[in-house]
């Protein structure tokens, strides 16, 4: 967990009540994640990119031709910024950063279909004015 998400985790029980869902307290994180860290899972290594906006400590993992994107970028959409602790300006900066990654990286969002960085930069209406032009 990125340390900037400590407040998000702290308010999770309240949020669960507000949204009418059950919440089971998770175990304490065994490690803090920071920009540029590496995380190895199943023989694959991913780089950590801190991309606040949807949440203060939101991170994505990229490497091996993929981006594990959480709620940053979706096919044709982006993560919500109307939630407590979300930050629209930070989201815009994070989206600009993710769009600097290679066009052919496959993005697996937290939910919804997979997409690519290039496809989203070319066609995602939420990236207008945020992303650099598509490479030809």
What are the functions of these language-model segments?
Residues 16-19, 79-85:
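Short glycine-enriched, charge-decorated loop/helix-capping segments at active-site entrances
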Residues 56, 66, 90-136:
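Divalent-metal (often Zn2+) His-rich catalytic cores of metallo-beta-lactamase-fold enzymes
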Residues 60-70, 74-75:
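Conserved beta-strand hairpin/beta-sheet module of binuclear metal-dependent hydrolase folds
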Residues 1-40, 44, 122-130:
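Active-site HxH/HxHxD metal-binding segment of metal-dependent hydrolases
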Residues 35-62:
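Core dinuclear metal-dependent hydrolase active-site scaffold
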Residues 9, 60-61, 78, 118:
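Active-site-flanking alpha-helical
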Residues 5, 57, 74, 79, ...:
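Short active-site segment of divalent metal-dependent hydrolases/proteases
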Residues 1-2, 50-53, 68-70, 106-111:
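Active-site neighborhood of phospho(di)ester-bond hydrolases with catalytic His/Asp-centered motifs
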